[in-house]
Amino acid sequence: IAISFPMMFSSKSNIKAWAEVLIGFALLFMGLEELKNSVPNLKENTEFLSFLSSYANMGILSTLIFIGVGTILTLVVQSSSAAMALTLVMCYEGYIPFELAAAMVLGENIGTTITANLAALVGNVHAKRAARAHFIFNIFGVIWMIFAFQFFINSIDNYMISNMDLSPVSSVGESVAVPIGLSIFHTTFNILNVLFLVWFVPLISRTVIRMQPSKGEIDEEFHLEHIGAGLMQTTELSVLEAQKEV
């Protein structure tokens, strides 16, 4: 931040843009560090440990349960990025094993589509269709991943053992084994999901058009309901209009 901040006052737009990028990354990692430090020591919480022991060894049912946990977590924090960061921190601290964390990541991919659909409620028909397509895209990705879940977990574990001498499944090596494995899982899942479902884009498009038909020209254009054109003389009324619009 100290290096990037003076660059913000540069007259060149490229330098200012790079300064914003560097400051953004710095704030991101500072936030992750604060999040890691603020997470309580859950290992001393017997109720939490008993919950994990009760639901960690139930096979496919454990996967489904923690997919639901990831979905709910994303809805609560209203951000899949924040939910993913919290999951990574919990993995780093050793609170949850790799398999359950990966299942939570799948749930977070579902949760982020729900928040997008909620945000699209005030949008036009195109925004609503995009939100529906996002939901269909991610939900089908999670469905096919459930069937290949254990294969992916074992493949990532074998890859990391061969190339990094780390094992996220058995937590052999440093404490970063599980977060690294989780990052590989998340990235691989999204790439493969795109490669698989890109061929079904026309079908998804037709489906969301049927799900969200247009109601005419009014529905095609987004417009504010409470805020009119121009600024009002009283700032209190302007704030009130903005609150109603939100």
Predicted regions and their residues:
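Hydrophobic core segments of alpha-helical transmembrane domains in multi-pass membrane transport
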Residues: 2-10, 24-35, 67-74, 140-151, ...
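Helix-loop-helix hairpins and the membrane-proximal interhelical loops
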Residues: 22-72, 90
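Non-transmembrane accessory domains of multi-pass membrane transporters/channels
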Residues: 191, 198-246
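Membrane-water interface regions at transmembrane-helix termini and the short interhelical loops
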Residues: 3-17, 120-126
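Membrane-interfacial loop-to-helix junctions in multi-pass transporters
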Residues: 50-68, 95-100, 170-180
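Structural signal for the N-terminal portions of transmembrane helices
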Residues: 22, 127-140, 167-202, 211
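Membrane-interfacial helix-loop connectors
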Residues: 1, 74-111, 120-122, 150, ...
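Transmembrane helix-bundle signature of multi-pass membrane transporters/permeases
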Residues: 1, 23-30, 71-75, 89-93, ...
